[in-house]
Design a protein with these regions (language model features):
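Conserved glycine-rich Rossmann-like NAD(P)H-binding loop of the short-chain dehydrogenase/reductase
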Residues: 29-46
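The beta1-alpha1 cofactor-binding region of Rossmann-like NAD(H)/NADP(H)-dependent oxidoreductases
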Residues: 41, 62-74, 105, 218-219
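Substrate-binding pocket helix/loop in short-chain dehydrogenase/reductase
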Residues: 99-100, 107-112, 194, 205
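C-terminal substrate-recognition "lid" of short-chain dehydrogenase/reductases
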Residues: 120-123, 213-242, 247
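Active-site helix of classical SDR
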Residues: 123, 159, 167
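Alpha-helical segment proximal to the catalytic Tyr-Lys
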Residues: 128, 172-176, 233
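Residue(s) in the substrate-gating loop at a strand-loop-helix junction
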Residues: 143
Length: 248
């Protein structure tokens, strides 16, 4: 039997990148997948079709995850159309890097809104559904910089540290209701963003990783499957650093 057979997963920011990889892996493991992105354009429709090709139900929803009302409306629609929400993955995220003295208020507010407030919005909307089910798994996508910080990314690091603390707090509050909450903290992952770096910077990063390679989106997706499935039924309030040993 597939690890996520019959479950419904809601993934934010999943039309591309890590979110898309998670959606496809979940579908491969039998989960029905609802996902959001700011717009569901041709790329989003293609992602929807790729997910559905695994023989599961799939639908993309256009939504600004940082908007409280829109998030509530999406969750209501997903519950009506899919019947349940068993797994929530808060993956929506952006970067607007800059050194502290050069960072604008807009850069700070935008990153906190998309990366952290969005997670609050969707958790707030999904928890009542999961409470009625007496089960649920919430996965916050954090980052190693949320654990250790990073110069030039004060806004991003703060948002990801917040994702970790949010997961731990929800785990404590919702554990008695059968709801688990954990965070994944990826390290240097090969995505479109990191591939845009010049080779010297990439080599420098990889030289600091004991496994001597960047991670793949599949590495993150496999970790999400573990946290979303019954394999991790006694795991909550934890942060899994998927970073090749970069931070120990």
């Amino acid at each position: 039997m597939k690890l996520l057979e019959g479950k419904t997963a809601l993934i934010t920011g999943a039309a591309r990148g890590i979110g898309k990889a998670i959606a496809l892996k979940f579908a491969e493991e039998g989960a029905n997948v609802a996902f959001t992105d700011l717009v569901i354009d041709e790329n989003g429709k293609a992602t929807e079709a790729e997910i559905a090709a695994y023989g599961v139900k799939a639908k993309g929803y256009a939504s600004n995850a940082a908007d409280f009302i829109q998030s509530e409306e999406v969750v209501k629609l997903v519950k009506e159309e899919f019947g349940s929400i068993d797994i929530l993955i808060n993956n929506a995220g952006i970067t607007k890097d800059g050194l502290m003295l050069r960072m604008t208020e807009q850069q700070w507010d935008a990153v906190i809104a998309v990366n952290l407030k969005s997670a609050f919005n969707f958790i707030h909307a999904c928890v009542p559904v999961m409470m009625r089910q007496r089960s649920g798994s919430i996965i916050n996508m954090a980052s190693v910089v949320g654990v250790h910080g990073n110069a030039g990314q004060a806004n991003y690091a703060a948002s990801k540290a917040g994702m970790i603390a949010l997961a731990k707090s929800v785990a404590q509050e919702m554990g008695p209701k059968g709801i688990r909450a954990n965070a994944i903290a990826p390290g240097f992952i090969d995505t479109a963003m990191t591939q845009a770096l010049n080779n010297d910077i990439r080599k420098e990063w990889i030289s600091k990783i004991p496994l001597r390679r960047g991670g793949t989106v599949e590495d993150i997706a496999n970790t999400a499957v573990y946290l979303g499935s019954e394999l991790s039924s006694y795991v909550t309030g934890q942060v899994l650093q998927v970073d090749g040993g970069m931070n120990m």
